[in-house]
Structures are given as structure tokens and as C-alpha cells.
Amino acid sequence: MPLSRSFRETVLARAQKDPEFRAEMISEATSAFLDGDIDTGKSLLRDYLNATNATSRIARSLKKDDKSLRRMLGPKGNPTLKNFIELLHACQHEEQIRFEVRAVHQ
């Protein structure tokens, strides 16, 4: 379902002001990937990059072209595990955060 423009603008505005919100966007994207929801994970990372205007910086750090990074996270994009891990690392570096993974029993 496409987001309404006002909701998207609200999310992007909050991401620009709130470092914890940006970190949570990356965390939620990671969780989506780990849960097998690749499309949601890509969408969240794309929203993060758009909200922070970090696409060029992160693309440079990955030694990739901006367009290549955008395609990777686009609806038909299919990032390799290596590309995904490098992208997560670059996003963490951008926000000066580090994730830890813990097993949770269900």
C-alpha cells in the first residue's frame, strides 16, 4: 500500500531531527531482512537514505554509484548478502551505532 504524502513527509522530517528514530529505521530494516521480508527491509533502508540525504556518502563508502545503490534497494533490486552487510555497516557508521544480535526463544 503506498504511503500518503503527508505520512511520508512526517517520517522523513522526524528522521532528519531524531537520531534514535534513524537508528530504529536501520534496526527495523535489519529485522525485516532477518525475518525474510526483503521488500520491507529495502523500503526502510531506502526511506532512511532519503531522509538523511546519505545516499551519496554511503555509495562512496561502498565504492558504488548512487544509481547502483538506489537500484539495489528498489522494488526489483536484489542485493547480495555481501552488499547488504556492507550497506548495514555503512549505515551504522553514518549514525555512529553498532548492532548486536541475540537469540530469542519463542
What are these regions, as identified by a protein language model?
Residues 50-70:
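Short alpha-helical DNA-recognition segment
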Residues 74:
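Residue-level detection of the helix-turn-helix DNA-binding "recognition helix"
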Residues 81-98:
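DNA major-groove recognition helix of helix-turn-helix/homeodomain DNA-binding modules
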Residues 1-44:
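N-terminal flexible/basic segments that precede or flank functional cores
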Residues 77-78:
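A secondary-structure capping/hinge motif
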Residues 5, 9, 71, 97-106:
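Short, charged recognition helix plus adjacent turn
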